[in-house]
From Swiss-Prot:
Keyword annotations from UniProtKB, A to Z: ATP-binding, Cell cycle, Cell division, Cell shape, Cell wall biogenesis/degradation, Cytoplasm, Ligase, Nucleotide-binding, Peptidoglycan synthesis
NCBIfam families (UniProt xref): murE (TIGR01085), PRK14022.1 (NF010628)
List of residues binding UDP-N-acetyl-alpha-D-muramoyl-L-alanyl-D-glutamate: S42, Q158, T160, T161, S187, R195
An example molecular function term from Gene Ontology annotations: magnesium ion binding
One Gene Ontology term from the biological process aspect of the record: cell wall organization
Name of the protein this chain belongs to: UDP-N-acetylmuramoyl-L-alanyl-D-glutamate--L-lysine ligase
Organism: Streptococcus pyogenes serotype M28 (strain MGAS6180)
Residue list for modification N6-carboxylysine: K229
Length: 481
């Protein structure tokens, strides 16, 4: 429960309070209200709900519906003049985060918080950290792929970083379940829209940066994207940073006065020997590590997670065991066909991650290589040119372009846009299952491979704003082995 007095105190301390408006005019102080629930969904309110009117598409009609369901007061940046009191604020998203934090009993103070950011690798690194910490502690995890609040049951995540009301409710459930640590992926969008406003992480990890999520509904420029990624560093007590990433010198200067540790080529924490399924490291994680996920970049993700977990109480033995146990749904999953050709299923969904995926496969498979690829509709439009550029640099690839969450766009138009950046012929098969079947039918022997990129473990396609059932790349590939 939270009272109106507590609520106003939170807003005033954050300089986010304008006034309370009701039929009698303006009020600096207010009383007589207490709330047992928080909501930003007008369909889920009653007389004891504190409702947040948020979003560029919010309509007064939503509020009218809530009032008919008993709503007595709401928080907003706008007075909709509907006859009930309104708490007016300058920034509704910041208000949501700080109020939710207090309403749910400040769960962030009862958990050790570890956050990963980066253009790619967040989910893999989060899974590594989860398995490392699980050796001696009780970690919960919020990731793009799956969320667990109790370490036993997993459910599909809706957002990389949940909305603040959901985030703190879930954190409180983690505390109730006896969890000791929480591992999170923190997206640039989470900072852009203040989902984690007011939250300080025990350790923040910056894996890498490359142009992505740049478009009309995301970040307008790379500078804006990079700035919002860096906010995790400002909001972490200690940081772990990849010294091999672009703009590392800037980040090193930024965190000079913070507790920090670097890994990669310009640091003392490096991988000294790398094999397909093992590596040796020097520095704080010196030792031998077995790993199921192939690729040097996955070994670096394991290093990043290990350095973070070392600070959070994990032993080197915990880290070694955790790395050896980690598998990630939809990340570098490998199947073998009856003719011994390989099928690689991976979530690679931007130019940089596609380049790394192709390089790893080419290292191990020297025959005919088939790539299945698409790009999402109505977001990250810059990826299409990036995909074309990467494919152009791998002339031995046979390419089939297909649907990948086309949303409100025509998947064939998206494929044609990607193809316009490739200087050789490619095939377009918009039905993703047919594209996979065709590619697999072209494999003849153990040196050949099909690379299915983009959707990973997703069992849906986003079409016209809705999630439409889709068997999933892995399930389809298994069917045609």
């Amino acid at each position: 429960m939270i009272t109106i007095e507590q609520l106003l105190d939170i807003l005033k301390k954050d300089h986010n309070f304008r006034e309370v408006l009701d039929a009698d005019g303006y009020h600096y102080h207010y009383q007589g209200f207490s709330f047992e629930r928080l909501s930003y969904d007008s369909r889920q309110v009653d007389g004891k709900t504190l409702f947040f009117a948020k979003g560029a598409t919010f309509k007064a009609d939503y509020l009218k519906e809530a009032i008919t369901n008993g709503l007595q007061l709401y928080i907003s940046e706008v007075d909709y003049e509907l006859g009930i009191p309104v708490v007016l604020v300058t920034d509704i998203k910041k208000a949501m985060s700080l109020i939710a934090m207090v309403f749910y009993g400040n769960p962030q103070e009862k958990l050790k918080l570890l956050a990963f950011t980066g253009t790619k690798g967040k989910t893999t690194a989060a899974y590594f950290a989860y398995h490392m910490l699980k050796e001696s502690y009780k970690p919960a995890m919020f990731s793009t792929m799956n969320t667990t609040l109790d370490g036993k049951t997993f459910f599909k995540s809706q957002l990389t970083t949940p909305e603040s009301l959901d985030l703190f409710a879930m954190m409180a459930e983690c505390v109730t379940n006896g969890m000791t640590h929480l591992i999170m992926e923190v997206s640039s969008q989470a900072y852009l829209v203040d989902r984690v406003y007011g939250l300080t992480f025990d350790v923040g990890v910056f894996l890498n940066i490359s142009p992505d999520h740049i478009g009309p509904i995301e970040h307008p420029t790379f500078e804006d994207y990079f700035y919002h990624k860096r906010l995790l560093m400002e909001n972490s007590r200690a940081v772990v940073i990849n010294s091999g990433m672009d703009h590392f010198s800037f980040l090193a200067d930024q965190v000079a006065d913070q507790e920090h540790v670097f890994y990669g080529p310009l640091s003392d924490n490096q991988i000294t020997t790398s094999q397909a399924f093992s590596f040796e490291a020097k520095g704080q994680l010196a030792g031998h590590y077995d790993i199921q996920l192939i690729g040097h970049f996955n070994q670096e993700n394991a290093m990043a997670a290990g350095l973070a977990c070392l600070r959070l109480g994990a032993s080197l033995a915990d880290i070694q065991k955790g790395i050896a146990k980690t598998r990630v749904p939809g990340r570098m999953e490998v199947l073998t066909m009856t003719n011994h050709a390989k099928v690689f299923v991976d979530y690679a969904h931007n130019g940089d991650s596609l380049e790394k995926l192709l390089s790893v496969v080419e290292e191990h498979q020297t025959g005919k290589l088939m790539l299945i690829l698409g790009a999402p509709g109505n977001k990250g439009e810059s990826r299409r040119a990036d995909f074309g550029r990467v494919i152009h640099q791998h002339p031995n690839l046979t390419v089939i372009l297909t649907a990948d969450d086309p949303n409100f766009e025509d998947p064939e138009d998206i494929s044609k846009e990607i193809a316009s950046h490739i200087a050789r012929p490619v095939e377009i098969i918009s039905d993703r299952e047919q594209a996979i079947q065709k590619a697999m039918s072209l494999c003849q022997g153990a040196k050949d491979a099909v690379i299915i990129a983009g959707k990973g473990a997703d069992a849906y396609q986003i079409v016209k704003g809705q999630q439409v059932a889709y068997a999933g790349d892995l399930a389809i590939a298994r069917h045609y082995l």
